[in-house]
Amino acid sequence: MRLVIARCSVDYTGRLTAHLPLATRLLLVKADSSVLVHSDGGSYKPLNWMSPPCTLRVAEPDDDDVGRGVREVWTVQNAKSDDRLVVRIHDVLSDSSHDLGVDPGLVKDGVEAHLQALLAEQIDLLGSGHVLVRREFPTAIGPVDILARSAAGETVAVEIKRRGDIDGVEQLTRYLELLGRDPLLAPVQGVFAAQEIKPQARVLAQDRGIRCLVLDYDAMRGLDDVDSRLF
């Protein structure tokens, strides 16, 4: 991983257009070719990014950029779309690279991991006709618990929690924003699945067009035998 702290401006073009004016920022270049732009705030969410597959090309600035004090231009081009991230670097304050090796991945809570495995096996709980695409679908900001397709062929991203709160909805929102940039996946529906969903989280999810799904852990494990109940 390469970490560069630099005074830079950033422009994103493609399905979306965004501009970040000149400021000091952290640029992350990961081994999977993804590039993320961070500020000293906003928690762990980048200001902008380009997810893989993409290529990074470093070039000398043209005369106009030189006149504005630009010393180096990074062009990050997505391999599957016209999305492009252009970083104009004025000053580099720090530049270091580190080999992090192979990461073992996130070790999820035992119940959450089991819920994910059970939902992948019982994908029709999302709705009739849904099919599993992949568990732990990789993105530049972490793996999506489950990626599926609806009967209509639309992409469905599922975030699974034992107890669903606002942080879980925010996490899913970031995944949806990122996945929605990929023309092969867009549009992407979101499903927030948990054993228990807090009222505030449900309201936030519904406001963002995210469907909520309450998971019955015992029933999914086959422990809730309705025919054997006395009441």
From Swiss-Prot:
Protein localization: Cytoplasm
Gene Ontology cellular component terms for the protein in this record: cytoplasm
Its EC number(s): 3.1.-.-
Coiled coil stretches, renumbered: none
Keyword terms, alphabetized: Cytoplasm, DNA-binding, Endonuclease, Hydrolase, Nuclease
Broad class of the protein's primary localization: cytoplasm
Similarity-based family: Belongs to the NucS endonuclease family.
NCBIfam families reported for this sequence: PRK03298.1
HAMAP family given in the database record: NucS
Descriptive protein name: Endonuclease NucS
Organism: Beutenbergia cavernae (strain ATCC BAA-8 / DSM 12333 / CCUG 43141 / JCM 11478 / NBRC 16432 / NCIMB 13614 / HKI 0122)
Gene label: nucS
